[in-house]
Amino acid sequence: MNIFEQTPPNRRRYGLAAFIGLIAGVVSAFVKWGAEVPLPPRSPVDMFNAACGPESLIRAAGQIDCSRNFLNPPYIFLRDWLGLTDPNAAVYTFAGHVFNWVGVTHIIFSIVFAVGYCVVAEVFPKIKLWQGLLAGALAQLFVHMISFPLMGLTPPLFDLPWYENVSEIFGHLVWFWSIEIIRRDLRNRITHEPDPEIPLGSNR
């Protein structure tokens, strides 16, 4: 199997792939969120003291929360890497619930990965292996298990509790599976063609 197999250039639809990736990114963000309801990745009793120092500049001492549940990766990324003063500041409220910048980041993160996946799939079809599960596993490995600890967004990999790995692995797999389902269905419906690596007229 040639993992670097490429599609015929005249069958590629980059603009359409990006458009579908935008849709898939928004929808799959809710899938990823939903996966964290029965399998929460972080606990309010696990502390992340290494990332708690800057909180004294944001909140009064009695309001500081050093738990992993509060100091989650999107929060720390916005605070430490983008310099957002308070990532929990409300973007809007709905039915009395606050939607903050951490939630916005979650959706943007999903859109970026979905667009990237859909565009790459136009050229390298093997990225779709196992209906997107390969891409989900790669995202888990390179983002959550390598990049996040190196960026200080999580504790070192071997300090993470087992339930966080279970939640994130499951979440990434169903996230990319949903992206692939949406990508394939919308692309095939809009173009009235199979994916570019499949010859036209094929029964596949």
From Swiss-Prot:
Membrane spanning segments where? 15-35, 101-121, 133-153
Q: Supply one GO BP term.
A: response to acidic pH
* Pfam families recorded: DUF1440
Q: Does the keyword Glycoprotein apply?
A: no
- The source's superkingdom equals Bacteria
Q: Which keywords does the record carry? A: Cell inner membrane, Cell membrane, Membrane, Transmembrane, Transmembrane helix
Q: How does it sit in the membrane?
A: Multi-pass membrane protein
Q: Which InterPro entries match?
A: DUF1440
Compartment(s) of residence: Cell inner membrane
> What does the entry list under GO cellular component?
plasma membrane
Put simply, this protein is called Inner membrane protein YagU
